[in-house]
Amino acid sequence: MNLMAQFTYDLNPVDFIIADAVGEPGKRTFYLQARAGKQSVSLVLEKQEVNNLAASVLQLLAELEEKYEDLPPIAHAKKVVYPEQPVEPSFRIGQLLIGYDEDTDRIWLIAKALMVNEEGSVIDPDDERVPSARIVTTRQQMYTMSEHALEVVSRGRPICPLCGRAIDRLGHFCPRTDGQAVPIIL
């Protein structure tokens, strides 16, 4: 089976992977970027998707440590990885799958683009026209990516303790106060 025919981008194994953001808080664009040799890919995600990916990876790593006690430990020292600039998105992620290959001790991600047809309906991610990427990493690379991703997500605007919405620099009118409170301004 020709895997390159299955994936628009097939990065196996990657030299680096990072989840990061560009722009000012409140207007940031979040992305997942990976490189293998001369091939690189930058994939756009939402902030919450980056957070969910990082949390899922850390949960998977914990489960793997429990299940496979003989796996080499992950170093918890932070390795600095910098994204390639400029960030040129290949596509916006519509579907993201994560898995583990115990034979190679590698974690893989399969990302499929979010595409819509002329009528505005979402195209099935399994449609052969939908761009996709396979990213194969070490457990260490995914740990480092996840720790950095959580740090990047936390750099955003503070969250209102009452309604859970982001507080803008210009102020925040919380719907939970029903207009009866002074706006929160940072």
Identify the meaning behind each predicted range:
Residues 1-186:
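Positively charged, low-complexity terminal tracts
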